[in-house]
Amino acid sequence: MPIFTTPFASLELLRQPHQPNEPLQAFDAADEYLLNHLHEQGLRAEDSLLLLNDSFGALACSLAGRCQVTSSSDSHLGFIALENNLAGNGLNRDAVRFLPSSETPQGPFDWVLIRVPKTLALLEEQLIRLHGQLAPGARVVAAAMVKHLPRAAGDLLEKYIGPVQASLAVKKARLLLATPEAKAAPHSPYPTRYRLDKPALELINHANVFCRDGLDIGTRAFLPHLPRHLDARRVADLGCGNGVLGIAYALGSPQAQLTLVDESYMAVQSARENWAAALGERPATIRAGDGLAEQPAGSLDLVLCNPPFHQQQVVGDFLAWRMFQQARAALVTGGELWIVGNRHLGYHAKLARLFRGVEQVAANPKFVVLKASK
C-alpha cells in the first residue's frame, strides 16, 4: 500500500473506489507541497482550517487532530475514502468535519487549502462562498499539478480573494498563494438554467454538474429512446446528474417509483430541485451515493444510465464497469439496464460479460443506446 509521508504524518491511503492492483495513488506531489508549505509557515492547534476538494482525504488525514479541520468536497466517493482512510490509519473520525459542497462552510477560517478542481466553475462557486468566512490575516493557498493548473484558476483567486503569487514548481506541482483583501459581496452565476423542448422542462445545473450550460449530447441521444414498453415500477437513474433521464421517464410513467443517485452532491441538489419543479410533491428517492452499492439485490425492474468515463483527471471505464456490476446485482431476473455510451468505448462487449442478452436500440455516428437484460 502506498505510504504518504509529510512533516505531519506517515499514512497508508487508498483511493475510492478501490481497485485490486490499483496503479494510481490517493495522493500526489501537490498534496505534499501544500502540507510542507503549511508546516513551514507554522500551524497552530487553535487554527481553524478549511480544505476544499481533498480528493481521497490525504490532506485531512495528515492534519486530523492538529487543528480544527473542515473538509468540503463535491464527491461522495471522496467522503467514503476520507472515512476509510481515517479508520485505516487509526484516526478519530470526529477529528475532521466533512461538509458536502451543497452547503456553505461557516468560518471564520485561518487557513484555506484548495486542491484546484477539474471544473473551474466549482472553484468559482467555492471562492464566492468564502466571502465573509475568512479570519483576519487568513491565508488561502491553492495547489495543483502543473499540467492541471490553468491560468484561469489564478484569475479566479485574484477576482474573489486578492493578489496571487505563484510558487516555483516542485516535483511538477505548484502553489498559488492568495492574499485576502476586502471585496464587495460577489454575485454567484450558479446555478445555470436552460430549457428542453422534448420533454418540455426548465432545468437547473449547479456549478459542478457535467455539461453545466445545457444538455450533454449523450443524454440528448438517449432521451428519444427511453423504454416505454416495460411494466417497470421500480426504476433507477444511475449517475443521474441533474436528473433529466429519471424525470423524463417519470413524466411518461405515472406509476413508476424512481430512485435517482449520483456521487456528486451538486448533481443531487440539482436533481432534487429539477424533480420538484417538474413533478411537484410526487415521491422519489434522490440521494448521494456510491452508485447502487446500497440498493438491495433484486429490488429494481429498470436502470437507466449515462455512465461517466472519468474520475477527476483520470480517464477510463472502471467507473462504468462498476456501475454495470451494481445494476446487475440490483435488478430482478428479467430486469433491464439501458445505457448510452460513446461508440469507441465498446460497452456492448462489456455488458455481454454480465448480462444474458445485449441489444443495440439506437445509434448515431458518436453514440449507441444499448439494452442489457438480466
Swiss-Prot record:
It comes from the Bacteria. Pfam families: MTS. The keyword Mitochondrion does not apply. It comes from Ectopseudomonas mendocina (strain ymp) (Pseudomonas mendocina). Its EC number is 2.1.1.174. It catalyses: guanosine(1835) in 23S rRNA + S-adenosyl-L-methionine = N(2)-methylguanosine(1835) in 23S rRNA + S-adenosyl-L-homocysteine + H(+). GO terms for molecular function: 23S rRNA (guanine(1835)-N(2))-methyltransferase activity; nucleic acid binding. GO terms for cellular component: cytoplasm. Belongs to the methyltransferase superfamily. RlmG family. It is an enzyme of class 2 (transferase). This is Ribosomal RNA large subunit methyltransferase G.
